[in-house]
Amino acid sequence: SFPVPVPARGIHCLVLDEDVAVYETVKELLGANHHVLWRTTVASALAVIASQHIAILVTELQVGDGDSSVMLKTLKQEYPDVLTIVNTSFKDTLRVSQLINQAQVFRYLPKPLRKGLLAKSLESTLTRYKQLQDVPALKVASKVEVSQDVQEKALSSKIMDYLSRLRAKGFGGGVVVQAV
């Protein structure tokens, strides 16, 4: 069942992981009709998100410049139609359940990466993305509330400010960036 069947027009998928094999597997599964971008830090991922319409984010929770959890929660506030697949070796069930509830993580996949499971997850994620595009009310329902945790609120505010500054500098104009 490779590559994964997807909507007629190409989408942008961002892989945030230090492991190039994850990027290469996602790129192989989505095929040539879609844009798969790869970043290894939260900061560089935010630059891509500010410049591209990202449909799917495949991410590890711990990356080069820290924890991506707050970024995931913040992105869901600003970009409710971005669907996230978390692929991680972390087994902290409280943290995972918080991400599912607060950041609306669409799929959680344990590492090591299993290609068949990732393929099925990408397929269901693309189906859900198409539903979000076809029914605008679903996008509104997908938006999450701002975190009440003081530290998360402060970091979330910094992330939102960073995204705004990137857009103001012209990163919102559709520049395609392929790799690190």
Regions found by a protein language model. Name each.
Residues 19-38, 42-44:
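Two-component/phosphorelay signaling modules centered on CheY-like receiver
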Residues 38-56:
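Acidic, metal-coordinating helix/loop segments flanking the phosphotransfer/catalytic sites
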Residues 50-52, 75-81, 102-103:
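Conserved phosphotransfer cores of two-component systems
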Residues 55-73, 78, 93-95:
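Conserved phosphotransfer microenvironments
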Residues 69-70, 91-108:
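Alpha4 helix (beta4-alpha4-beta5 surface) of REC/receiver domains from two-component response regulators
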Residues 87-88:
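Hydrophobic/aromatic residues positioned on beta-strands within the core alpha/beta folds
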Residues 113-122, 126, 130:
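C-terminal output helix
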Residues 140-180:
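C-terminal output/effector regions of signal-responsive regulators
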